[in-house]
UniProtKB/Swiss-Prot annotation:
Main location: cytoplasm
Keyword Endoplasmic reticulum among record annotations: no
Gene encoding the protein: infA
Protein name per Swiss-Prot or TrEMBL: Translation initiation factor IF-1
Protein role: One of the essential components for the initiation of protein synthesis. Stabilizes the binding of IF-2 and IF-3 on the 30S subunit to which N-formylmethionyl-tRNA(fMet) subsequently binds. Helps modulate mRNA selection, yielding the 30S pre-initiation complex (PIC). Upon addition of the 50S ribosomal subunit IF-1, IF-2 and IF-3 are released leaving the mature 70S translation initiation complex.
Organism: Actinobacillus pleuropneumoniae serotype 5b (strain L20)
Length: 72
């Protein structure tokens, strides 16, 4: 899928789920399930509850997302 089709949003980690999945609350109040992108996994970026993250979502399934950045 092309990068232009993705929707980027800011959110906060609510809870950690098994298999590097996370429950993320977006700025607009929606709660989605997100997984870590491959580059973050490769570089061992640690994500904890309460972290501010940037997620990208596809327009086809708005209940799932990919975490692409963790704010400092």
């Amino acid at each position: 899928m092309a990068k232009e089709d993705c929707i980027e949003m800011q959110g906060t980690i609510l809870e950690t789920l098994p298999n590097t999945m996370f429950r993320v609350e977006l700025e607009n109040g929606h709660v989605v399930t997100a997984h870590i992108s491959g580059k973050m996994r490769k570089n061992y970026i640690r994500i904890l509850t309460g972290d501010k993250v940037t997620v990208e979502m596809t327009p086809y399934d708005l209940s799932k997302a990919r975490i692409i950045f963790r704010a400092r």
